[in-house]
């Protein structure tokens, strides 16, 4: 896997982050400059004709703005807050815009929302905290992309896992499966040597075996390679008890 280990160190620390939230959270994450993206339940573009509905919508938006202002003031005590967005719908578009405007290196998700697939093709680390982030024990699940090892190196104890999931029909995919298995062996061996971590390459189900190994190793954090794809990542984030970081 020569040349595939990538080390990305943010300038001056973990620098620019978009923070996605609905409610107030403890400002205890790594960042220096942040953009707050506050998600609100909105009308979703529905046409409003009744005056009563228009007034109610206006009141809801005024409340949302006031609440966002309080969040802004709260985070200003700890971070350089350079932007604030309030999204009532089109959450994915608002997130992409915030990331591009800030030039963010990290997105912290403190609430659930659909994951924009476009973010998986960009060099942005996606963090889904479960309570406070802890890196005492971590599981990293490898795939086809080059991981950001700066995050992996934060783990005190790291286990590297690659899961080769068979495709159907098996008789047509045996050669492809063997080649993929051998590639994963080579790449995880290099990562293991670089990060001084144990490793395993298995045949199995990406979602189920990730969750199983996370429980088995008592992982505080699951690092996921972005090459695992949007569907697998969303399923793991939804079901995992540990924090998830997409690298």
Swiss-Prot record:
Protein name: Uncharacterized protein AF_0179
């Amino acid at each position: 896997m020569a040349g595939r280990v990538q080390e990305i160190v943010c300038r001056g620390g973990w620098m620019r982050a978009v923070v996605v939230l609905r409610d107030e959270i403890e400002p205890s994450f790594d960042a220096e400059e942040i953009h707050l993206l506050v998600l609100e339940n909105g009308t979703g573009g529905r046409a409003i004709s009744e005056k009563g509905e228009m007034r109610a919508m206006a009141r809801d938006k005024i409340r949302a703005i006031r609440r966002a202002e309080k969040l802004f003031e709260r985070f200003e005590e700890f971070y350089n807050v350079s932007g604030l967005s309030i999204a009532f719908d089109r959450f994915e578009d608002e997130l992409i815009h915030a990331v591009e405007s800030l030039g963010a290196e990290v997105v912290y998700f403190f609430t659930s929302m659909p994951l924009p697939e476009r973010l998986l093709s960009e060099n942005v680390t996606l963090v889904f905290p479960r309570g406070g982030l802890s890196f005492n024990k971590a599981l990293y699940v490898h795939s086809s992309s080059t991981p950001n090892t700066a995050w992996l190196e934060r783990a005190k104890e790291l286990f590297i896992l690659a899961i080769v999931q068979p495709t159907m029909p098996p008789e047509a995919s045996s050669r492809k499966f063997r080649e993929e298995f051998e590639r994963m062996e080579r790449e995880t061996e290099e990562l293991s040597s670089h990060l001084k971590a144990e490793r395993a390459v298995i045949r199995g189900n990406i979602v189920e075996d990730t969750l199983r190994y996370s429980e088995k190793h008592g992982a505080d954090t699951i690092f996921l390679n972005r090459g695992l794809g949007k569907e697998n990542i969303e399923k793991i984030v939804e079901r995992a008890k540990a924090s998830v970081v997409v690298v």
